[in-house]
């Protein structure tokens, strides 16, 4: 029986993530003040809805930026994985905030149907167009580039996407009000935009809760991983007791591997580690190698897939 673990890390994507968040925070915070004032002056709920999203965005971007900074702290004896999970927690809080603000906007829109208020279409249009441009800039800052975005940047981008949709909705409502004078267009567009944002927020909430509950990554099929290891690594007879979870954006795995006693134990261990890295991007794996079938009380976890279909070469 043998244990091994491998671990590598890189901070370059985190640096890029932090830079994205900082620039988007500057753009969003600056324009939020303009939109809040404009929303009150014009009397437009669609603008106030967009301003509400921008207010949430500003806090969300700041929180996400702080989380990325904290996540860079090195591991300690007490926090052995460092602070990587803090970014997931920030994404969870961001998703909750987005759900709450969306519900409040829908509630206010319903109130507007009961007691309509005058809306100044011209001012509403000017501010909505400016808001759209600011949101496009923020969204581009968060999304451009090919490197991996972490869950916080995804969360922040969803907030900004909500704002972008809000600005489009405000422009459509402003056009209707300018052309026809029909003010119910304002709360109607607010509700439609809010429902679109709510759908995205729900997806983000599910992803962050899955990570906080240490669920396996949705993209990883554990049964297939076990089958492939038994089929593609000749010495592997059985893979069991597999645990996979996420720490920040990094997948972490522990597993038991029953093997034919190898001529070179360390070479086989190294082969398994490289296999997990190359095929599943798992940089941190703790592997327990066994020469006999495992008889521990919890060794048959995930044993639904037979590990005996393997090839000898």
Swiss-Prot record:
SUPFAM superfamilies: Cation efflux protein cytoplasmic domain-like, Cation efflux protein transmembrane domain-like. It is found in: Cell inner membrane. Residues 1-20, 69-89, 143-159, 203-313 are cytoplasmic. The chain crosses the membrane at residues 21-41, 48-68, 90-110, 122-142, 160-180, 182-202. GO terms for biological process: zinc ion transmembrane transport; zinc ion transport. GO terms for molecular function: zinc ion transmembrane transporter activity. Residues 42-47, 111-121, 181 are periplasmic. This is Zinc transporter ZitB. It is a multi-pass membrane protein. Appears to be selective for zinc, not conferring resistance to cobalt nor cadmium. Keywords: Cell inner membrane, Cell membrane, Ion transport, Membrane, Transmembrane, Transmembrane helix, Transport, Zinc, Zinc transport. Belongs to the cation diffusion facilitator (CDF) transporter (TC 2.A.4) family. SLC30A subfamily. It comes from Escherichia coli (strain K12). The keyword Membrane applies. Induction: By zinc. It comes from the Bacteria. Involved in zinc efflux across the cytoplasmic membrane, thus reducing zinc accumulation in the cytoplasm and rendering bacteria more resistant to zinc. It may contribute to zinc homeostasis at low concentrations of zinc, whereas ZntA is required for growth at more toxic concentrations. GO terms for cellular component: plasma membrane. Gene3D superfamilies: Cation efflux protein transmembrane domain, Cation efflux protein, cytoplasmic domain.
């Amino acid at each position: 029986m043998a244990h091994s673990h491998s671990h590598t890390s890189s901070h370059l994507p985190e640096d890029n993530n932090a830079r994205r968040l900082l620039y988007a925070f500057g753009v969003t915070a600056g324009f939020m003040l303009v939109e809040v004032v404009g929303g009150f002056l014009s009397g437009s709920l669609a603008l106030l809805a967009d301003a509400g999203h921008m207010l949430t965005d500003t806090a969300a971007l700041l929180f996400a930026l702080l989380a990325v900074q904290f996540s860079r702290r090195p591991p300690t004896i007490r926090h052995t994985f460092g602070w990587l999970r803090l970014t997931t927690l920030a994404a969870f809080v961001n998703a909750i905030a987005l759900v709450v603000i969306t519900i409040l906007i829908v509630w206010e829109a319903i109130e507007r149907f009961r007691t309509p208020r005058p809306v100044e279409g011209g001012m509403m249009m000017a501010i909505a167009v400016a808001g759209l441009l600011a949101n496009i800039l923020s969204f581009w800052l968060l999304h451009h580039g090919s490197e991996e975005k972490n869950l916080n940047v995804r969360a922040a981008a969803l907030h900004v996407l909500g704002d972008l949709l809000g600005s489009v909705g405000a422009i459509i409502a402003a056009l209707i009000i300018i052309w026809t004078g029909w003010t119910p267009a304002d709360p109607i567009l607010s509700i439609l935009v809010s429902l679109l944002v709510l759908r995205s927020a729900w997806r983000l909430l599910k992803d962050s809760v899955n990570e906080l509950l240490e669920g396996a990554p949705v993209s990883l099929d554990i049964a297939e991983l076990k089958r492939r290891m038994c089929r593609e690594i000749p010495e592997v007879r059985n893979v069991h007791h597999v645990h996979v979870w996420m720490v920040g954006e990094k997948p972490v795995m522990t597993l038991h591997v029953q093997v034919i006693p190898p001529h070179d134990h360390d070479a086989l261990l190294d082969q398994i580690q490289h296999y997990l890295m190359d095929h599943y991007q798992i940089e941190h794996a703790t592997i327990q190698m066994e020469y006999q079938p495992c008889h521990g009380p919890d060794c048959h976890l995930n044993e639904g897939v037979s590990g005996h279909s393997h090839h000898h070469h």
